[in-house]
Every structure is written in structure tokens, then in C-alpha cells.
């Protein structure tokens, strides 16, 4: 199933039995659709997950019990955002580690178990990544996967494929505290910022604000250590990236 989390901390559980038609046309999903139009986060929940970690632009986060989120009344205020807003969230388990990434190219790795599981409904944001640079803010939160290559995309179209942390000489070490500033993940120039990061199995498609798109096979991108600048992937202002599946034409083999 999936969870939709609005920028102001309201949540909706989308069970497997809800069809696309039900969601698009159902009056009961009107507020949820409006929240998605305003930048809500769509989170996939694996069966092994027991927690939902909600992350705000200012780097603060909170860990909530997933079973309570799933059974909550649709649109319930599960977290109080105060003067910030939710930018990302992920479903995870007690044994997982999380990777926080900021727009200035900083990254922080932390164990989920270091965060207290908050059972009080509508609680505020607490621990997280310490945002120290002016104009910086958190942009992504992922379940850390050291055996996979992380692809990082910048607003000005730079594409960076990192060595897996099993291979890299500059590893993303786990933090000992619950609020630190992070390490350098991607080297940026001028006003460029990170807009997305993902673990892609086969390919990545970069999307710009004027409707252009360009795809890359992950295996065709040279993998490097963190704190590198990456290659030019596409011209224009990138707004996000999505994972792509590559199919091979049997007649061309």
C-alpha cells in the first residue's frame, strides 16, 4: 500500500483495493488530491516496514508507528509542522538506516533506531539534519542501500552516479548523534542545487520545467566517489527525476 503525506502534515492511506478511478473521481479523496497538487509526498510502504519517518525542509524529522498511520482517519494531522513544511518521508524498519540529502549537496546517514518512535498524535518535528548554510534545505530522505549506486541530479542538469558504499573510498559514515550537518555528497557550482536522488536499477529520466526529458542507462554513467561534480545530463531547469526500466528490442540483439 501507499501513504500520501501533505506538506502540512496530514496523511491518507491508499490501500491496494483502491483503484485509480476511485481515487480520481471519489469525493472522499478530494482533499487528498488537492494536497498532491500542492506538493504532497507519495510513499510506498514495503511489508517489512514498521515506521514512517517524516522529514521537513528545515532538516527536522519525526518517526511514527506505521500501523497507527495506516489506520488513522483519512486526512488526520499526524505531525505538526509549525513554520516549516514536509518535504519527504519514507517507510522503514527498526533495522534500517536513512540517508538525508540537502539542496546544497550535503548528506547524512543515520540509524532509524536512534530516533524515538513517537506515539503521540500530531507531535512536532524533533531530531534530524542540521541545516547550517543560508538558503539550504532538505530535499530527499531515502532508506540507505550501501550495495546500490545512488544517482544524484541537480537543478542545472548535472547527473552524478556514485560508487556503492561497498566500493567507495569516500564512504558516507553513519552519524553517532541524531542532529549533524552531514558530509559533502555532490559538488555544485554557482547557484546550482540538488533536486533529486534515487537508487535506480536500470535507468534514470531527468524532467525539466519546460516539459523536456532525457533518459540515461545507469550502467552507461561512470560511477565516482562522493563530492564530485557529475556530468551534464540535460539543458534546462530540472525539477525531478524518475526511475526508468530499459527494454531491449529482440530484433536488435
Regions found by a protein language model. Give the residues of each.
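Short, structured "edge-of-domain" segments at secondary-structure transitions
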Residues: 1-253
Amino acid at each position: 500500500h501507499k501513504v500520501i503525506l501533505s506538506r502540512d502534515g496530514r496523511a491518507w492511506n491508499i490501500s491496494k483495493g483502491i483503484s485509480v478511478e476511485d481515487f480520481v473521481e471519489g469525493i472522499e479523496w478530494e482533499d487528498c488530491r488537492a494536497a498532491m497538487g500542492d506538493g504532497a509526498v507519495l510513499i510506498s510502504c514495503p511489508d517489512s516496514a514498521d515506521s514512517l519517518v517524516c522529514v521537513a525542509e528545515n532538516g527536522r524529522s519525526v518517526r511514527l508507528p506505521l500501523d497507527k498511520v495506516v489506520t488513522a482517519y483519512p486526512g488526520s494531522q499526524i505531525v505538526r509542522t509549525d513554520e516549516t513544511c514536509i518535504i519527504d518521508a519514507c517507510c522503514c524498519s527498526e533495522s534500517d538506516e536513512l540517508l538525508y540529502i540537502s539542496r546544497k549537496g550535503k548528506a547524512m546517514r543515520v540509524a532509524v533506531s536512534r530516533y524515538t518512535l513517537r506515539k503521540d498524535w500530531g507531535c512536532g518535528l524533533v531530531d534530524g539534519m542540521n541545516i547550517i548554510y543560508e538558503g539550504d534545505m532538505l530535499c530527499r530522505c531515502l532508506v540507505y542501500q550501501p550495495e546500490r549506486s545512488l544517482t544524484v541530479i541537480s537543478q542545472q542538469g548535472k547527473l552524478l552516479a556514485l560508487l556503492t558504499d561497498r566500493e567507495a573510498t569516500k564512504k558516507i559514515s553513519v552519524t553517532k548523534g541524531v542532529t549533524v550537518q552531514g558530509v559533502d555528497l555532490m559538488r555544485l557550482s554557482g547557484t546550482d542545487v540538488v533536486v533529486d536522488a534515487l537508487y535506480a536499477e536500470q535507468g534514470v529520466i531527468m524532467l525539466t520545467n519546460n516539459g523536456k526529458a532525457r533518459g540515461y542507462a545507469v550502467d552507461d554513467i561512470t560511477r565516482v566517489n562522493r563530492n564530485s561534480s557529475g556530468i551534464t545530463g540535460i539543458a534546462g531547469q530540472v525539477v525531478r527525476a524518475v526511475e526508468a526500466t530499459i527494454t531491449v528490442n529482440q530484433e536488435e540483439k
